[in-house]
Amino acid sequence: MWINANLASLTAQDSVVLANNRQVLAFKKTWNLQRGTSALPQTFAWKQYLQNTWKAINPNSSKRLISAIESRTLINQSMTRLGQIVDTRLLDEVVKNMDYCHAHLINPTQLLDSHHQNSELFSAWMLDYQQTKLTLNVLDVNDLSTLILNRDREISQPYLYGFKTLTPEQSGLFANIGHQVLSANQPNTHSSNQTFNTTSDEIFHVATWAKDLHSKHPEKHIAIVSPQLNSEHHQIKSIFDQVFDDVLVGTGQKAYNISLGLPLTDYPFIRHLLSVLQLSQQLQSNRISTETFNAVITSPYIAHAQVEQSSRALLVNQVLSWSQTHFKLNQLSPHLINTPLLDALINNISSKAVSGRQKHDQWLLSFNTYLLAWGFATDRTLSSVEYQLFNKYQQTSLGLNQLAQINDKVSASQAVVDLQTWLSQVIFQAQSAKTPIQILGSLEAEGLYFDEAWVLGMTDDFLPAALNAPRFIPNDIAAQHQIPHSNFELIAKDAKDTLNNLINLSDQVNFSYAKTHFESEQHRSPLLPFNNEIETPKQPHQPALLETINDTQAAPLVDKQVSGGVGILKDQMACAF
Protein backbone atom coordinates (compact mmCIF):
# COMPACT_ATOMS: atom_id res chain seq x y z
CA MET A 1 0.00 0.00 0.00
CA TRP A 2 1.57 3.24 -1.20
CA ILE A 3 0.68 6.58 -2.76
CA ASN A 4 1.43 7.00 -6.46
CA ALA A 5 3.40 10.24 -6.26
CA ASN A 6 7.00 11.38 -6.66
CA LEU A 7 8.42 12.52 -3.30
CA ALA A 8 11.85 13.58 -4.58
CA SER A 9 11.24 17.31 -3.99
CA LEU A 10 10.26 16.95 -0.31
CA THR A 11 12.62 17.55 2.60
CA ALA A 12 12.48 16.90 6.34
CA GLN A 13 11.52 20.54 6.92
CA ASP A 14 8.34 20.23 4.86
CA SER A 15 4.89 19.29 6.13
CA VAL A 16 2.34 17.22 4.21
CA VAL A 17 -1.42 17.24 4.81
CA LEU A 18 -3.27 14.17 3.56
CA ALA A 19 -6.98 13.44 3.29
CA ASN A 20 -7.12 10.62 5.87
CA ASN A 21 -5.06 8.53 8.26
CA ARG A 22 -4.66 5.61 5.86
CA GLN A 23 -3.02 7.93 3.34
CA VAL A 24 -0.65 9.05 6.12
CA LEU A 25 0.44 5.42 6.60
CA ALA A 26 0.76 4.92 2.84
CA PHE A 27 2.85 8.11 2.54
CA LYS A 28 5.31 6.85 5.17
CA LYS A 29 5.69 3.51 3.37
CA THR A 30 6.19 5.30 0.05
CA TRP A 31 8.80 7.58 1.60
CA ASN A 32 10.71 4.59 2.92
CA LEU A 33 10.58 3.01 -0.55
CA GLN A 34 11.64 6.13 -2.47
CA ARG A 35 13.90 7.91 0.03
CA GLY A 36 15.17 5.12 2.25
CA THR A 37 16.38 6.32 5.64
CA SER A 38 16.07 10.05 4.85
CA ALA A 39 14.35 12.08 7.58
CA LEU A 40 10.58 12.03 7.12
CA PRO A 41 8.60 15.27 6.66
CA GLN A 42 5.83 16.03 9.13
CA THR A 43 2.70 14.23 7.95
CA PHE A 44 -0.84 14.93 9.13
CA ALA A 45 -4.42 14.11 8.34
CA TRP A 46 -6.62 17.23 8.11
CA LYS A 47 -7.78 17.44 11.73
CA GLN A 48 -4.35 16.50 13.03
CA TYR A 49 -2.93 19.39 11.02
CA LEU A 50 -5.41 21.83 12.57
CA GLN A 51 -4.60 20.68 16.10
CA ASN A 52 -0.83 20.70 15.58
CA THR A 53 -0.85 24.15 13.94
CA TRP A 54 -3.08 25.68 16.63
CA LYS A 55 -0.83 24.33 19.40
CA ALA A 56 2.24 25.67 17.60
CA ILE A 57 0.87 29.23 17.32
CA ASN A 58 -0.88 29.19 20.73
CA PRO A 59 1.39 27.16 23.03
CA ASN A 60 0.13 28.89 26.18
CA SER A 61 -3.57 29.20 25.36
CA SER A 62 -5.91 29.27 28.34
CA LYS A 63 -8.59 27.48 26.32
CA ARG A 64 -8.75 23.69 26.42
CA LEU A 65 -9.28 21.73 23.22
CA ILE A 66 -12.01 19.17 23.83
CA SER A 67 -12.31 15.80 22.12
CA ALA A 68 -15.02 14.86 19.64
CA ILE A 69 -16.78 12.79 22.32
CA GLU A 70 -16.75 15.70 24.79
CA SER A 71 -18.18 17.87 22.04
CA ARG A 72 -21.02 15.37 21.50
CA THR A 73 -21.72 15.42 25.24
CA LEU A 74 -22.01 19.21 25.31
CA ILE A 75 -24.22 19.22 22.20
CA ASN A 76 -26.44 16.62 23.87
CA GLN A 77 -26.69 18.84 26.94
CA SER A 78 -27.62 21.88 24.84
CA MET A 79 -30.37 19.97 23.05
CA THR A 80 -31.73 18.57 26.32
CA ARG A 81 -31.62 21.99 27.94
CA LEU A 82 -33.79 23.35 25.12
CA GLY A 83 -36.41 20.64 25.64
CA GLN A 84 -35.37 18.10 23.00
CA ILE A 85 -35.48 14.36 23.71
CA VAL A 86 -32.16 13.09 22.34
CA ASP A 87 -31.34 9.65 20.97
CA THR A 88 -28.17 8.44 19.27
CA ARG A 89 -29.45 8.75 15.68
CA LEU A 90 -30.65 12.31 16.20
CA LEU A 91 -27.40 13.30 17.89
CA ASP A 92 -25.36 11.77 15.05
CA GLU A 93 -27.34 13.80 12.51
CA VAL A 94 -26.98 17.02 14.50
CA VAL A 95 -23.21 16.55 14.86
CA LYS A 96 -22.90 15.85 11.12
CA ASN A 97 -24.89 18.98 10.24
CA MET A 98 -22.80 21.12 12.60
CA ASP A 99 -19.67 19.80 10.90
CA TYR A 100 -21.20 20.73 7.53
CA CYS A 101 -21.90 24.25 8.75
CA HIS A 102 -18.29 24.77 9.84
CA ALA A 103 -16.72 23.09 6.81
CA HIS A 104 -18.93 24.97 4.33
CA LEU A 105 -19.00 28.32 6.18
CA ILE A 106 -22.73 28.40 6.90
CA ASN A 107 -23.66 30.95 9.56
CA PRO A 108 -26.42 30.06 12.05
CA THR A 109 -28.21 33.31 11.16
CA GLN A 110 -28.68 31.99 7.61
CA LEU A 111 -30.58 29.06 9.05
CA LEU A 112 -32.69 31.32 11.26
CA ASP A 113 -33.59 33.48 8.26
CA SER A 114 -34.64 30.42 6.24
CA HIS A 115 -37.88 30.14 8.27
CA HIS A 116 -37.69 26.33 8.23
CA GLN A 117 -38.78 24.98 11.59
CA ASN A 118 -36.12 22.25 11.70
CA SER A 119 -33.40 24.69 10.68
CA GLU A 120 -34.45 27.24 13.29
CA LEU A 121 -34.44 24.56 15.99
CA PHE A 122 -31.03 23.31 14.84
CA SER A 123 -29.67 26.86 14.84
CA ALA A 124 -30.84 27.33 18.43
CA TRP A 125 -29.01 24.14 19.47
CA MET A 126 -25.86 25.29 17.71
CA LEU A 127 -25.92 28.76 19.29
CA ASP A 128 -26.49 27.28 22.75
CA TYR A 129 -23.55 24.92 22.21
CA GLN A 130 -21.33 27.84 21.17
CA GLN A 131 -22.34 29.73 24.31
CA THR A 132 -21.59 26.66 26.44
CA LYS A 133 -18.07 26.50 25.01
CA LEU A 134 -17.53 30.17 25.86
CA THR A 135 -18.76 29.61 29.41
CA LEU A 136 -16.47 26.60 29.92
CA ASN A 137 -13.56 28.29 28.09
CA VAL A 138 -13.09 25.36 25.70
CA LEU A 139 -12.67 24.84 21.96
CA ASP A 140 -13.50 22.05 19.55
CA VAL A 141 -11.70 21.16 16.34
CA ASN A 142 -14.18 23.15 14.23
CA ASP A 143 -13.04 26.38 15.92
CA LEU A 144 -9.38 25.97 15.00
CA SER A 145 -9.33 27.10 11.36
CA THR A 146 -10.72 30.53 12.30
CA LEU A 147 -8.13 30.90 15.07
CA ILE A 148 -5.34 29.92 12.67
CA LEU A 149 -6.55 32.51 10.14
CA ASN A 150 -6.29 35.18 12.86
CA ARG A 151 -2.74 34.18 13.84
CA ASP A 152 0.05 36.68 14.47
CA ARG A 153 2.91 34.65 13.04
CA GLU A 154 3.89 33.00 9.76
CA ILE A 155 3.23 29.34 9.04
CA SER A 156 5.20 27.24 6.58
CA GLN A 157 3.28 26.25 3.46
CA PRO A 158 2.22 22.59 3.48
CA TYR A 159 1.95 20.12 0.63
CA LEU A 160 -1.53 18.68 0.02
CA TYR A 161 -2.31 15.17 -1.19
CA GLY A 162 -5.42 13.05 -1.64
CA PHE A 163 -8.19 15.67 -1.35
CA LYS A 164 -10.85 15.14 -4.02
CA THR A 165 -12.41 18.55 -3.41
CA LEU A 166 -11.39 21.06 -0.76
CA THR A 167 -14.22 22.35 1.41
CA PRO A 168 -14.69 26.15 1.61
CA GLU A 169 -13.07 26.02 5.07
CA GLN A 170 -10.01 24.20 3.72
CA SER A 171 -9.81 26.40 0.61
CA GLY A 172 -9.90 29.58 2.68
CA LEU A 173 -7.28 28.39 5.14
CA PHE A 174 -4.82 27.06 2.55
CA ALA A 175 -5.29 30.15 0.37
CA ASN A 176 -4.34 32.26 3.39
CA ILE A 177 -1.36 30.14 4.41
CA GLY A 178 -0.27 29.15 0.93
CA HIS A 179 0.23 25.57 -0.21
CA GLN A 180 1.56 23.27 -2.89
CA VAL A 181 -0.21 20.24 -4.32
CA LEU A 182 1.58 16.90 -4.34
CA SER A 183 0.09 15.53 -7.54
CA ALA A 184 -0.83 11.87 -7.82
CA ASN A 185 0.19 9.96 -10.91
CA GLN A 186 -3.15 8.83 -12.37
CA PRO A 187 -2.60 7.71 -15.98
CA ASN A 188 -5.28 5.00 -16.17
CA THR A 189 -8.58 5.50 -17.96
CA HIS A 190 -9.59 1.87 -18.62
CA SER A 191 -10.46 -1.14 -16.51
CA SER A 192 -11.60 -4.76 -16.78
CA ASN A 193 -15.32 -4.95 -15.94
CA GLN A 194 -17.15 -8.17 -15.06
CA THR A 195 -20.70 -9.20 -14.15
CA PHE A 196 -21.83 -11.96 -11.77
CA ASN A 197 -25.22 -13.47 -11.00
CA THR A 198 -25.10 -13.05 -7.20
CA THR A 199 -22.95 -11.24 -4.67
CA SER A 200 -21.90 -14.62 -3.26
CA ASP A 201 -20.58 -15.62 -6.70
CA GLU A 202 -18.83 -12.27 -7.00
CA ILE A 203 -17.13 -12.45 -3.60
CA PHE A 204 -16.18 -16.12 -4.06
CA HIS A 205 -14.59 -15.36 -7.45
CA VAL A 206 -12.62 -12.42 -6.05
CA ALA A 207 -11.47 -14.43 -3.02
CA THR A 208 -10.25 -17.22 -5.32
CA TRP A 209 -8.54 -14.65 -7.54
CA ALA A 210 -6.76 -13.11 -4.55
CA LYS A 211 -5.70 -16.50 -3.18
CA ASP A 212 -4.28 -17.67 -6.52
CA LEU A 213 -2.52 -14.36 -7.10
CA HIS A 214 -1.03 -14.40 -3.61
CA SER A 215 0.22 -17.97 -3.99
CA LYS A 216 1.97 -17.12 -7.28
CA HIS A 217 3.25 -13.68 -6.23
CA PRO A 218 3.41 -13.50 -2.41
CA GLU A 219 5.28 -10.20 -2.55
CA LYS A 220 2.43 -8.35 -4.31
CA HIS A 221 0.12 -6.01 -2.40
CA ILE A 222 -3.52 -6.70 -3.28
CA ALA A 223 -6.50 -4.41 -2.62
CA ILE A 224 -10.11 -5.56 -2.61
CA VAL A 225 -12.49 -2.61 -2.34
CA SER A 226 -16.09 -3.01 -1.21
CA PRO A 227 -18.23 0.17 -1.20
CA GLN A 228 -20.75 -1.61 1.07
CA LEU A 229 -18.17 -3.06 3.45
CA ASN A 230 -20.20 -2.22 6.56
CA SER A 231 -23.28 -4.14 5.44
CA GLU A 232 -21.44 -6.95 3.62
CA HIS A 233 -18.70 -7.46 6.21
CA HIS A 234 -19.96 -10.80 7.54
CA GLN A 235 -20.65 -12.23 4.09
CA ILE A 236 -17.19 -11.23 2.86
CA LYS A 237 -15.50 -12.60 5.98
CA SER A 238 -17.37 -15.90 5.77
CA ILE A 239 -16.53 -16.52 2.11
CA PHE A 240 -12.90 -15.44 2.45
CA ASP A 241 -12.48 -17.69 5.49
CA GLN A 242 -13.78 -20.64 3.46
CA VAL A 243 -11.57 -19.93 0.46
CA PHE A 244 -8.44 -19.27 2.53
CA ASP A 245 -9.30 -22.02 5.06
CA ASP A 246 -9.08 -19.44 7.87
CA VAL A 247 -12.31 -20.22 9.73
CA LEU A 248 -10.57 -21.26 12.95
CA VAL A 249 -7.68 -18.81 12.64
CA GLY A 250 -7.51 -15.77 14.91
CA THR A 251 -7.83 -12.25 13.50
CA GLY A 252 -4.13 -11.53 13.78
CA GLN A 253 -3.06 -14.62 11.80
CA LYS A 254 -5.48 -14.55 8.85
CA ALA A 255 -4.15 -14.42 5.30
CA TYR A 256 -6.13 -11.23 4.69
CA ASN A 257 -7.14 -8.15 6.66
CA ILE A 258 -10.58 -6.51 6.62
CA SER A 259 -10.14 -2.83 7.38
CA LEU A 260 -13.30 -2.28 9.37
CA GLY A 261 -13.36 -1.23 12.99
CA LEU A 262 -16.35 -1.60 15.32
CA PRO A 263 -17.47 0.43 18.34
CA LEU A 264 -15.84 -0.86 21.50
CA THR A 265 -19.25 -1.78 22.92
CA ASP A 266 -19.81 -4.24 20.04
CA TYR A 267 -17.07 -6.53 21.36
CA PRO A 268 -18.13 -9.30 23.81
CA PHE A 269 -15.12 -8.60 26.05
CA ILE A 270 -16.25 -5.01 26.65
CA ARG A 271 -19.88 -6.08 27.13
CA HIS A 272 -18.73 -8.52 29.84
CA LEU A 273 -16.75 -5.73 31.50
CA LEU A 274 -19.73 -3.38 31.55
CA SER A 275 -21.94 -6.15 32.96
CA VAL A 276 -19.46 -6.61 35.81
CA LEU A 277 -19.70 -2.90 36.64
CA GLN A 278 -23.50 -3.00 36.47
CA LEU A 279 -23.70 -6.04 38.76
CA SER A 280 -21.33 -4.42 41.25
CA GLN A 281 -23.65 -1.44 41.53
CA GLN A 282 -26.70 -3.74 41.80
CA LEU A 283 -25.11 -5.80 44.59
CA GLN A 284 -24.48 -2.65 46.59
CA SER A 285 -28.03 -1.39 46.07
CA ASN A 286 -29.41 -4.91 46.78
CA ARG A 287 -31.53 -5.00 43.63
CA ILE A 288 -29.96 -7.56 41.32
CA SER A 289 -31.01 -8.04 37.70
CA THR A 290 -31.41 -11.71 36.78
CA GLU A 291 -30.09 -11.12 33.27
CA THR A 292 -27.00 -9.22 34.46
CA PHE A 293 -26.27 -11.69 37.27
CA ASN A 294 -26.41 -14.71 34.97
CA ALA A 295 -24.22 -13.00 32.37
CA VAL A 296 -21.54 -12.15 34.93
CA ILE A 297 -21.30 -15.39 36.91
CA THR A 298 -20.89 -17.41 33.71
CA SER A 299 -18.38 -14.94 32.27
CA PRO A 300 -14.98 -16.52 31.51
CA TYR A 301 -13.28 -13.28 32.52
CA ILE A 302 -14.01 -13.14 36.27
CA ALA A 303 -11.92 -14.91 38.92
CA HIS A 304 -12.14 -18.71 39.31
CA ALA A 305 -14.40 -19.04 36.25
CA GLN A 306 -12.83 -22.32 35.18
CA VAL A 307 -12.75 -23.90 38.65
CA GLU A 308 -16.45 -23.29 39.36
CA GLN A 309 -17.73 -23.44 35.79
CA SER A 310 -20.21 -26.30 36.33
CA SER A 311 -21.54 -25.18 39.71
CA ARG A 312 -22.04 -21.62 38.43
CA ALA A 313 -24.01 -22.96 35.46
CA LEU A 314 -26.29 -24.83 37.88
CA LEU A 315 -26.69 -21.61 39.88
CA VAL A 316 -27.96 -19.93 36.71
CA ASN A 317 -30.66 -22.60 36.45
CA GLN A 318 -31.63 -21.97 40.06
CA VAL A 319 -31.95 -18.22 39.50
CA LEU A 320 -34.01 -18.75 36.34
CA SER A 321 -36.37 -21.05 38.22
CA TRP A 322 -37.46 -18.07 40.35
CA SER A 323 -38.99 -16.46 37.23
CA GLN A 324 -38.09 -12.98 38.49
CA THR A 325 -36.50 -10.08 36.64
CA HIS A 326 -34.86 -8.86 39.87
CA PHE A 327 -34.07 -10.40 43.25
CA LYS A 328 -32.34 -9.54 46.53
CA LEU A 329 -29.10 -10.82 47.99
CA ASN A 330 -30.73 -12.67 50.91
CA GLN A 331 -32.69 -14.76 48.40
CA LEU A 332 -29.45 -15.72 46.65
CA SER A 333 -27.18 -16.39 49.62
CA PRO A 334 -28.48 -19.89 50.58
CA HIS A 335 -27.76 -21.13 47.05
CA LEU A 336 -24.08 -20.07 47.01
CA ILE A 337 -22.95 -23.05 49.10
CA ASN A 338 -21.67 -24.90 46.02
CA THR A 339 -19.81 -21.84 44.71
CA PRO A 340 -17.72 -20.69 47.70
CA LEU A 341 -15.28 -18.69 45.56
CA LEU A 342 -18.14 -16.81 43.89
CA ASP A 343 -19.73 -16.33 47.31
CA ALA A 344 -16.55 -14.65 48.53
CA LEU A 345 -16.46 -12.36 45.49
CA ILE A 346 -20.10 -11.32 45.95
CA ASN A 347 -19.68 -10.69 49.69
CA ASN A 348 -16.57 -8.63 49.02
CA ILE A 349 -18.39 -6.40 46.53
CA SER A 350 -21.65 -6.07 48.47
CA SER A 351 -19.85 -5.22 51.72
CA LYS A 352 -18.06 -2.21 50.23
CA ALA A 353 -19.34 1.18 51.28
CA VAL A 354 -22.17 2.34 49.05
CA SER A 355 -21.25 5.50 47.19
CA GLY A 356 -23.89 8.10 46.54
CA ARG A 357 -23.45 10.69 43.84
CA GLN A 358 -19.88 11.38 42.72
CA LYS A 359 -17.99 13.11 39.94
CA HIS A 360 -17.07 10.96 36.96
CA ASP A 361 -13.37 10.83 37.85
CA GLN A 362 -14.25 9.41 41.27
CA TRP A 363 -16.50 6.82 39.67
CA LEU A 364 -13.61 5.78 37.42
CA LEU A 365 -11.59 4.92 40.53
CA SER A 366 -14.55 2.94 41.89
CA PHE A 367 -14.94 1.07 38.60
CA ASN A 368 -11.28 0.10 38.62
CA THR A 369 -11.72 -1.16 42.20
CA TYR A 370 -14.70 -3.27 41.13
CA LEU A 371 -12.78 -4.86 38.26
CA LEU A 372 -9.87 -5.60 40.58
CA ALA A 373 -12.18 -7.17 43.17
CA TRP A 374 -13.78 -9.42 40.55
CA GLY A 375 -10.34 -10.43 39.25
CA PHE A 376 -11.48 -9.37 35.80
CA ALA A 377 -9.35 -10.75 32.94
CA THR A 378 -7.10 -12.70 35.33
CA ASP A 379 -8.53 -16.24 35.26
CA ARG A 380 -6.89 -17.20 31.99
CA THR A 381 -4.41 -15.86 29.47
CA LEU A 382 -6.06 -13.30 27.21
CA SER A 383 -5.94 -13.66 23.45
CA SER A 384 -4.19 -10.99 21.41
CA VAL A 385 -7.50 -9.29 20.54
CA GLU A 386 -8.71 -9.40 24.17
CA TYR A 387 -5.41 -7.96 25.39
CA GLN A 388 -5.64 -5.10 22.89
CA LEU A 389 -9.27 -4.50 23.87
CA PHE A 390 -8.39 -4.29 27.57
CA ASN A 391 -5.61 -1.81 26.84
CA LYS A 392 -7.96 0.25 24.67
CA TYR A 393 -10.60 0.23 27.40
CA GLN A 394 -8.10 1.46 29.98
CA GLN A 395 -7.05 4.32 27.70
CA THR A 396 -10.60 5.23 26.68
CA SER A 397 -12.08 5.07 30.18
CA LEU A 398 -9.84 8.00 31.13
CA GLY A 399 -12.38 10.08 29.22
CA LEU A 400 -14.46 10.04 32.41
CA ASN A 401 -11.87 12.45 33.82
CA GLN A 402 -12.83 14.85 31.03
CA LEU A 403 -16.54 14.41 31.74
CA ALA A 404 -15.84 15.37 35.36
CA GLN A 405 -14.88 18.84 34.14
CA ILE A 406 -18.17 19.50 32.36
CA ASN A 407 -20.70 17.52 34.46
CA ASP A 408 -22.02 17.61 38.02
CA LYS A 409 -22.10 14.63 40.37
CA VAL A 410 -23.99 11.59 39.08
CA SER A 411 -25.24 8.26 40.43
CA ALA A 412 -23.43 4.95 39.87
CA SER A 413 -25.94 3.76 37.27
CA GLN A 414 -25.65 7.03 35.34
CA ALA A 415 -21.85 6.84 35.46
CA VAL A 416 -21.98 3.34 33.93
CA VAL A 417 -24.32 4.61 31.20
CA ASP A 418 -21.98 7.54 30.49
CA LEU A 419 -19.01 5.16 30.31
CA GLN A 420 -20.91 2.91 27.91
CA THR A 421 -21.84 5.91 25.74
CA TRP A 422 -18.22 7.07 25.72
CA LEU A 423 -16.95 3.61 24.72
CA SER A 424 -19.56 3.34 21.95
CA GLN A 425 -18.03 6.37 20.22
CA VAL A 426 -14.57 4.79 19.95
CA ILE A 427 -13.98 2.65 16.87
CA PHE A 428 -11.53 -0.18 17.43
CA GLN A 429 -9.85 -2.68 15.15
CA ALA A 430 -7.33 -5.15 16.53
CA GLN A 431 -3.86 -4.99 15.06
CA SER A 432 -3.10 -7.93 12.83
CA ALA A 433 -0.02 -9.43 11.29
CA LYS A 434 1.19 -7.77 8.12
CA THR A 435 -0.64 -9.23 5.16
CA PRO A 436 -0.49 -8.16 1.50
CA ILE A 437 -4.25 -8.69 0.98
CA GLN A 438 -6.29 -5.72 2.19
CA ILE A 439 -10.11 -5.53 2.09
CA LEU A 440 -11.24 -1.93 2.56
CA GLY A 441 -13.99 0.57 1.85
CA SER A 442 -14.01 2.90 -1.13
CA LEU A 443 -13.42 6.13 0.82
CA GLU A 444 -10.25 4.91 2.53
CA ALA A 445 -9.00 3.28 -0.69
CA GLU A 446 -9.02 6.50 -2.71
CA GLY A 447 -5.60 8.04 -3.17
CA LEU A 448 -3.76 4.75 -2.51
CA TYR A 449 -1.82 2.51 -4.87
CA PHE A 450 -1.42 -1.30 -4.95
CA ASP A 451 0.14 -3.92 -7.20
CA GLU A 452 -3.29 -5.41 -7.95
CA ALA A 453 -6.82 -4.19 -7.19
CA TRP A 454 -10.42 -5.35 -7.53
CA VAL A 455 -13.47 -3.18 -6.81
CA LEU A 456 -16.66 -5.03 -5.88
CA GLY A 457 -20.24 -3.79 -5.92
CA MET A 458 -20.10 -1.30 -8.80
CA THR A 459 -23.86 -0.80 -8.81
CA ASP A 460 -25.94 2.31 -9.42
CA ASP A 461 -26.50 2.48 -5.66
CA PHE A 462 -22.79 3.27 -5.27
CA LEU A 463 -21.95 5.41 -8.31
CA PRO A 464 -23.45 7.86 -8.77
CA ALA A 465 -24.53 8.33 -5.16
CA ALA A 466 -28.12 9.13 -4.27
CA LEU A 467 -29.31 12.65 -3.50
CA ASN A 468 -28.83 13.11 0.25
CA ALA A 469 -29.37 16.64 1.52
CA PRO A 470 -28.64 17.42 5.20
CA ARG A 471 -31.63 17.09 7.51
CA PHE A 472 -31.31 20.49 9.21
CA ILE A 473 -29.93 22.63 6.37
CA PRO A 474 -32.40 23.81 3.68
CA ASN A 475 -31.75 22.44 0.20
CA ASP A 476 -31.04 25.83 -1.37
CA ILE A 477 -28.45 26.71 1.30
CA ALA A 478 -26.86 23.25 1.08
CA ALA A 479 -26.52 23.48 -2.71
CA GLN A 480 -25.26 27.08 -2.55
CA HIS A 481 -22.49 26.07 -0.13
CA GLN A 482 -21.67 22.88 -2.10
CA ILE A 483 -22.41 20.33 0.60
CA PRO A 484 -21.71 16.86 -0.90
CA HIS A 485 -24.66 15.03 -2.49
CA SER A 486 -26.97 18.02 -2.07
CA ASN A 487 -27.60 18.41 -5.81
CA PHE A 488 -27.09 16.40 -8.98
CA GLU A 489 -24.21 18.50 -10.31
CA LEU A 490 -22.17 17.87 -7.16
CA ILE A 491 -23.08 14.17 -7.26
CA ALA A 492 -21.95 13.86 -10.88
CA LYS A 493 -18.61 15.55 -10.17
CA ASP A 494 -18.01 13.45 -7.07
CA ALA A 495 -18.83 10.25 -8.97
CA LYS A 496 -16.38 11.16 -11.74
CA ASP A 497 -13.60 11.93 -9.23
CA THR A 498 -14.31 8.74 -7.27
CA LEU A 499 -14.20 6.57 -10.39
CA ASN A 500 -10.93 8.18 -11.48
CA ASN A 501 -9.38 7.47 -8.07
CA LEU A 502 -10.56 3.85 -8.11
CA ILE A 503 -9.35 3.20 -11.66
CA ASN A 504 -5.90 4.36 -10.55
CA LEU A 505 -5.65 2.08 -7.52
CA SER A 506 -3.32 -0.02 -9.66
CA ASP A 507 -1.94 -0.28 -13.18
CA GLN A 508 -4.76 -2.73 -13.94
CA VAL A 509 -7.99 -2.62 -11.93
CA ASN A 510 -10.91 -5.04 -12.10
CA PHE A 511 -14.46 -3.79 -11.50
CA SER A 512 -17.47 -6.02 -10.95
CA TYR A 513 -21.07 -6.03 -9.83
CA ALA A 514 -23.68 -8.71 -9.12
CA LYS A 515 -27.16 -8.80 -10.64
CA THR A 516 -28.76 -9.90 -7.38
CA HIS A 517 -28.03 -9.49 -3.70
CA PHE A 518 -30.06 -11.78 -1.40
CA GLU A 519 -32.89 -11.99 -3.97
CA SER A 520 -32.89 -8.20 -4.54
CA GLU A 521 -32.19 -7.07 -8.08
CA GLN A 522 -29.22 -4.76 -8.69
CA HIS A 523 -28.18 -2.65 -11.68
CA ARG A 524 -24.74 -1.72 -12.90
CA SER A 525 -23.27 1.72 -12.48
CA PRO A 526 -23.97 3.78 -15.62
CA LEU A 527 -20.41 5.11 -15.46
CA LEU A 528 -18.89 1.83 -16.67
CA PRO A 529 -19.73 -0.70 -19.42
CA PHE A 530 -20.18 -4.29 -18.22
CA ASN A 531 -20.11 -6.71 -21.14
CA ASN A 532 -18.18 -9.64 -19.67
CA GLU A 533 -20.51 -11.91 -17.70
CA ILE A 534 -18.77 -14.54 -15.58
CA GLU A 535 -20.46 -17.88 -15.07
CA THR A 536 -19.19 -18.90 -11.68
CA PRO A 537 -18.95 -22.69 -11.37
CA LYS A 538 -20.98 -24.17 -8.57
CA GLN A 539 -18.92 -24.64 -5.46
CA PRO A 540 -18.43 -28.34 -4.77
CA HIS A 541 -20.08 -29.47 -1.56
CA GLN A 542 -19.02 -32.92 -0.43
CA PRO A 543 -20.70 -34.57 2.54
CA ALA A 544 -18.41 -35.27 5.44
CA LEU A 545 -17.36 -38.87 5.88
CA LEU A 546 -19.44 -40.51 8.59
CA GLU A 547 -18.27 -43.33 10.78
CA THR A 548 -21.04 -45.79 11.63
CA ILE A 549 -21.15 -47.61 14.93
CA ASN A 550 -23.09 -50.83 15.41
CA ASP A 551 -25.06 -50.11 18.58
CA THR A 552 -27.67 -52.84 18.24
CA GLN A 553 -25.84 -54.90 20.83
CA ALA A 554 -24.73 -53.59 24.21
CA ALA A 555 -23.44 -54.89 27.51
CA PRO A 556 -26.19 -56.17 29.81
CA LEU A 557 -27.50 -53.76 32.44
CA VAL A 558 -26.28 -54.94 35.83
CA ASP A 559 -28.55 -52.89 38.12
CA LYS A 560 -32.00 -52.69 36.55
CA GLN A 561 -33.45 -50.51 39.33
CA VAL A 562 -33.83 -46.87 38.22
CA SER A 563 -34.11 -44.07 40.79
CA GLY A 564 -33.93 -40.29 40.68
CA GLY A 565 -35.68 -39.97 37.36
CA VAL A 566 -38.05 -37.28 38.60
CA GLY A 567 -35.13 -35.17 39.77
CA ILE A 568 -33.43 -35.51 36.39
CA LEU A 569 -36.59 -34.44 34.56
CA LYS A 570 -37.01 -31.52 36.96
CA ASP A 571 -33.45 -30.32 36.32
CA GLN A 572 -33.98 -30.62 32.56
CA MET A 573 -37.19 -28.59 32.73
CA ALA A 574 -35.46 -25.89 34.78
CA CYS A 575 -32.58 -25.61 32.33
CA ALA A 576 -32.86 -22.56 30.08
CA PHE A 577 -30.96 -24.30 27.32
Summary of predicted features, one role per range:
Residues 122, 180, 508:
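Residue-level detector of anion-binding/catalytic polar loops
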